[in-house]
Amino acid sequence: LTDFRDASEEILPGDQVLLQRTRTGIEMLNRRYRPDGQDLFFLLHRPRRWNAGEGLWMGYERKRGKLTEFNALLRGGSRGCFSEIVGETAILPAIKYVITLDTDTQFPRDAARQLVGTMAHPLNRPQFDAQRGIVAEGYSILQPRVGVSLPSARRSWFVRLFAGDAGIEPYTREVSDVYQDEFHEGSFIGK
């Protein structure tokens, strides 16, 4: 899922070169790793749209917008919000779980298996209440605890002030989350 960076213009020099490079990379990965002829890698790119509040051309609602529009596509919605799609998308409606990674995400070995296993557990499976329009039981989003790595702990005054001590101290830093414990809900933390 990609957007171009925010800009004062809708189209910048170099946009198409970057998009073509990404397209070529995705196509190369699919040629190399395609089992049974099904694509494993996709590019879904959105164009910049004018945001009057920000006074910029940008991807609609940034990360939240990308995930919302991608989720709609997975559920059979329109492809119209994406200006460039690479990969055979027929498989997309069969996708059950989505794991989002950022450039600063640390994703240890077997973490995906553990996340999917947690979501697939019978007590965690979301039960949608169509009348109220909510997930009434279980969970539809799982977010591991957000932490600060040792290398980034001194990056800025903001990080030092709000992150506390960095590193691993499992016994002195273990805490519960009041919202999760009492209401079975959490505060989503994202970029």
Q: What does each model-identified segment do?
A:
Residues 1-191:
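Internal catalytic domains of large membrane-associated glycosyltransferases
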